[in-house]
Structures are given as structure tokens and as C-alpha cells.
Amino acid sequence: MLFRSITDNMSVMLDCSSTALFIARRIKDRKNLTIITNSLEILIELKDAKNLKIFSSGGLLGEDSFALVGNQADRMISEFHVNASIISCKGFDIDKGFTDSHDMHASTKRVMLENCDTRVLAVDSSKFNHIAFNVVGTLSDIDVIVTDVKPPKEWAERFEKAKVECLYPADAEEAAK
């Protein structure tokens, strides 16, 4: 569902999450796609893709991760404007927003969301009702949530009120009935 919305000739930012790596693997056959990422894993995954233009953010190699972060990464990312930024998070709480465990990762994710037309949070249900240390943003900071299950009714109502589109697999809706 999310993969179909990433089409040829688009520009996309992907963060350093395992979710973004999964997405990168699914879209590397697109034509004339420009990808900007701070993930070393995504750079390695896409290095042989023939029809992609790939930009690395540069920056400081993050502790305990394959992410490039810090002021240099944020500054480079802020020099671009893309069709969509796709990020993930360590926790998502309907009241507190979406969070990350590292301050520099959170900063880079915020910069990605500031420099795009469509702001996408890709978050699996295991992150629901969890709060990590650093706030990345709230519902007002995203346009689309992509998840693996139909959200609880209260959450769906909050998404609708905030004008956030929620995408989940059709079979998740059937399972919720």
C-alpha cells in the first residue's frame, strides 16, 4: 500500500529505521527516484540500484547504530525539499506523539518532516502506547500514518480530527471485526 504510492520520478527521504530499510528494499526497482537518507544500511542496500539517485546526509556516525546524525546531517537534509519523508519511531502515544530514544535521531527526523510535501509516519503496532525519551512530533506534524493493524476506534477518531490519513492492510480491518 505505501509502496504503491512511491512512484517513478519522486523524491523521498528515508530515516535510519528498520522500517525505512524494509521500504527501501521494496522500492529500489523504481525509475528516476531520488532518495535522501541518513542510513548507512539503506545506502548499502541501494548501492547497485541502477535507476536511483541516492544522497547521503553525511554527519556523525551515531552510537550503536548505522545512522549519520548531528548538525551536519541535519543541515544537509534541510537543503532539500522532497515529495515525501518517511520516518519511523521507537514509540507512539496518541497524546504524547511519536518519540525516539536518541536525541540526534529525533532531531534528524524532525528536519526530514520539515522539508517535504507529505509527512509519513510508518509505525508497527508494537510501538503503540510506548513513549521513548525524545519527542519527535505530534499528530499535527504528520499527514499519513502507515501501520500493520487497524487502530483502536479512539485513535481513528483522533486521526480523523487531526486530518491524518491512516493506512493499514485490508486484512487487518477484517481481523478487527
Positions of the model-derived regions?
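Structural signal for interior beta-strand "rungs" in well-ordered beta-sheet cores
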Residues: 12-13, 29, 42, 145
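Conserved phosphate- and dinucleotide-binding cores of soluble alpha/beta proteins
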Residues: 43-177
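Short alpha-helical
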Residues: 18-21, 41, 153
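Short beta-strand scaffold positions
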Residues: 14-15, 37, 147
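Short, small-residue-biased leader/transition segments that mark boundaries at the very start
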Residues: 1-2
